[in-house]
Amino acid sequence: MLNLYEILKEVLNESVSSDSVNDAINNKYRILINYDDEDNHATGTRLVEPYVLGYTKAGNLAFRGYQYEGDTVRGVPKWKLFRLDRVINWQPTKQKFNVEPKDNGWSAESYNSNSDGSLTSILNQV
């Protein structure tokens, strides 16, 4: 018997397209997502600013974003990597975000793909 989470995951599981991510990056829109992490922990709603779209070492399409609020195991606010195939629901909020240094000193202007060990190929960035 499927539990409610599995049913919702099956109904809502439309992986986000790279076009949707590009649109959010180009327009600097905050997004609301539900994310299915590896261990099915923290699958609730998250508020994220998407900054970079690219491929991981394993060849998965992913985006690097700054998560301000929402469900997470590692706490917020924090920079995180989100695989597109694990995004269960994607909703642009139309709230714009400012590109400025974050509390850890990382900023979109200073992003260096060579220092991001998670993304090996960058397709788009703020």
Functional labels for PLM-detected ranges:
Residues 13-126:
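Core beta-strand-centered patch of the WYL/Sm-like small regulatory domain
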Residues 2-16:
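Proteolytic processing junctions in secreted/extracellular precursors
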